[in-house]
């Protein structure tokens, strides 16, 4: 039973690190199509409403979010790395530090997911308000990218869904670990009583 449990926690810790790295890559790519399609629609960044495409200011509006999103994804990677530093992925018996680390990763993952989901959905709505007829005309004139795709907005459902599932399983694993340790201590106590 312990081997299965330890194997599961190794897989969970590694999976959380991989998902966090994918979210980091996502934070680097989320603005790519917006840049290619919308950057040159605004002639003067100091006057965002003077544009050849109505609504194209979403690219500029997302800049601060994207900076914070990148920083938050790095923090999430560091939190997941801390699982390996505290050896949470391989300990048969958890110490208080392992439980604290597990709680930090879980809280960070849930908070990050809720915050990012709200922001990305708001910017997706702003993107969908763009006048796509004007964008098509602009793209034809300037030979720039034309897209109505919301792929970069929608993929967050998969990534943050995996993160939330991962942290829920990490918490479940810690509870399971605690239960196994209590059962082991009860067996040891019974053995000591029988020997006495």
Mark where each language-model region is.
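Alpha-helical transmembrane segments and their immediate interhelical/interface regions
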Residues: 1-5, 55-93
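Cytosolic juxtamembrane helix at the C-terminal end of the final transmembrane segment
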Residues: 2-8, 85-97, 120-128, 162-195
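Loop-to-transmembrane boundary segments
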Residues: 5-15, 147-157
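Hydrophobic alpha-helical membrane-insertion segments
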Residues: 15-32, 100-122
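Interfacial non-cytosolic loop connecting adjacent transmembrane helices
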Residues: 34-66, 115-154
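Hydrophobic cores of alpha-helical transmembrane segments in multi-pass inner/ER membrane proteins
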Residues: 75-80, 157-171
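Hydrophobic alpha-helical transmembrane segments
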Residues: 96-100, 155-158
């Amino acid at each position: 039973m312990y081997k299965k449990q330890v194997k599961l926690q190794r897989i969970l810790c590694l999976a959380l690190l991989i998902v966090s790295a994918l979210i980091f890559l996502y934070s680097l790519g989320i603005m790519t199509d917006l840049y290619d399609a919308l950057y040159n629609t605004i002639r003067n960044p100091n006057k965002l409403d003077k544009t050849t495409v109505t609504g194209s200011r979403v690219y500029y509006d997302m800049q601060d979010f994207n900076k914070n999103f990148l920083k938050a994804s790095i923090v999430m990677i560091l939190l997941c790395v801390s699982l390996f530093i505290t050896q949470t992925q391989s300990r048969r018996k958890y110490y208080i530090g392992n439980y604290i680390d597990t709680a930090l990763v879980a809280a960070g993952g849930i908070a990050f997911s809720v915050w990012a989901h709200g922001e990305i959905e708001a910017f997706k709505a702003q993107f969908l308000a763009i006048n796509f007829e004007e964008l098509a005309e602009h793209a034809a004139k300037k030979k720039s990218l034309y897209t109505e795709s919301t792929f970069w907005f929608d993929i967050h459902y998969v990534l943050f869904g995996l993160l939330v599932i991962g942290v829920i399983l990490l918490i479940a694993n810690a509870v399971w670990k605690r239960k196994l340790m209590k059962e082991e201590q009860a067996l040891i106590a019974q053995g000591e009583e029988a020997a006495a």
